[in-house]
Amino acid sequence: MKHGIKKNKLSRCTEHRLSMLKNLSISLINHEQIVTTLPKAKALRPYVEKFITIAKNNDSLHGRRLLLSRLHNSKLVVDKLLSVLANRYQDRKGGYSRIIKFGTRKGDCAPMAVIELVDRDISAKGEIYSKNKKGSKVVTQS
């Protein structure tokens, strides 16, 4: 019986849904703003906010390994979470993301939404946190 389970299944099996949420969260953390459907954005919001809370509270090796295990071993995204986003949201208790309704998609009239991180640098649109060949972290323009 499924008493008290209120998560949206998004018409997908468990593995597909979790993989999709991980990929969407990696894109959101990397770009700090993405356009997706409204149900996906609503399912993604608590998922990403838990990652930011883990990064804020666990700046140790344990926190890094916990985030790596939940984000497809994406080291650049975990580095950005621990260095940039954890410092940005140090004083904020929660509510790290916002959902803005964006109209409907032309093909199937699906409701679209923009999900973005609060207090993001708007002038850094299109920049991606990455590493150069020497191993130092840089922000590149995409």
UniProtKB/Swiss-Prot annotation:
The keyword Ribosomal protein applies. Signal peptide: none annotated. Gene3D superfamilies: Ribosomal protein L17. One of its GO terms (molecular function) is structural constituent of ribosome. The keyword Chloroplast does not apply. It holds the Pfam family Ribosomal_L17. GO terms for biological process: translation. One of its GO terms (cellular component) is cytosolic large ribosomal subunit. Keywords: Ribonucleoprotein, Ribosomal protein. Part of the 50S ribosomal subunit. Contacts protein L32. This is Large ribosomal subunit protein bL17. It comes from Wolbachia pipientis subsp. Culex pipiens (strain wPip). The gene is rplQ.
